[in-house]
């Protein structure tokens, strides 16, 4: 009986990942080299975060908008995993109940999300999202949940890249969206201290209709600087 009780106690204190229970996502590696690259926000991987140009998306966030800035929000789209200005950390005033910390990428045309990656930052695992969603919208106001997670920390390492696929980790999409938003509702640290951080986000998909803009045409995040790619 004592052996059984000890085993049950051990199991009860293990995370789903440690216990080998199926969790969403596939770990594909660590560090910048593990990023897939060429996502919808920057198909050519030539975005210039210092100037906020050469992106195919306009970015907005609930807090700390901008690249650089001392761990500002847009750093999750800089195509680099690392400390400091290569991550978004740590929020200014806690995560408001039901509101969340969110960052949105606005594309020029609707896309069907086929897969995405989410990466941990360089330190403090208790800042990793544990309750979070990826959402889509076509007006930037009303968002529909595409993927949701509420559970143990999915990351097992720092600067780790996890891939999430349609039909495996979330439903195959039949509606295309122009806006894709990542929103965090809870971390292990919430609501205490420096509670939140993300390393990188990548979104991938197919045009929702035949009128979608050629991804080789680069649009700055300020909308209007068009660069023709050969």
Model-inferred region functions:
Residues 152-158:
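Short proline/glycine- and polar residue-rich coil/turn motifs
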Residues 2-12:
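Bacterial N-terminal signal peptides
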Residues 19-62, 218, 223:
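Extracellular carbohydrate-recognition regions
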Residues 12-20:
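Bacterial Sec-dependent signal peptides at the C-terminal "C-region" and cleavage site
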């Amino acid at each position: 009986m004592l052996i059984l009780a000890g085993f049950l106690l051990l199991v009860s204190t293990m995370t789903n990942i440690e216990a080998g229970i199926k969790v969403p996502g596939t770990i594909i590696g660590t560090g910048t080299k593990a990023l897939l690259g060429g996502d919808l926000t920057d198909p050519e991987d030539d975005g210039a975060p210092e100037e906020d140009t050469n992106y195919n998306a306009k970015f907005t966030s609930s807090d700390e908008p901008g690249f650089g800035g001392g761990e500002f929000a847009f750093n999750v789209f800089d195509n680099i995993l690392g400390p400091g200005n290569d991550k978004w950390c740590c929020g200014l005033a806690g995560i408001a109940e039901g509101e969340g910390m969110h960052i949105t990428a606005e594309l020029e045309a609707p896309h069907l999300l086929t897969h995405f990656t989410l990466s941990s930052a360089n330190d403090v695992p208790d800042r990793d999202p544990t309750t979070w969603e990826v959402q889509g919208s076509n007006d930037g106001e009303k968002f529909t949940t595409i993927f949701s997670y509420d559970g143990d920390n999915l990351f097992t390492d720092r600067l780790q890249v996890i891939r999430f696929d349609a039909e495996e980790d979330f439903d195959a999409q039949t509606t295309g969206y122009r806006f894709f938003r990542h929103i965090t509702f809870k971390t292990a640290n919430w609501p205490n201290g420096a509670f939140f951080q993300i390393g990188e986000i990548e979104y991938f998909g197919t045009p929702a209709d035949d009128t979608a803009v050629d991804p080789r045409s680069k649009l700055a995040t300020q909308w209007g600087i068009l660069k023709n790619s050969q």
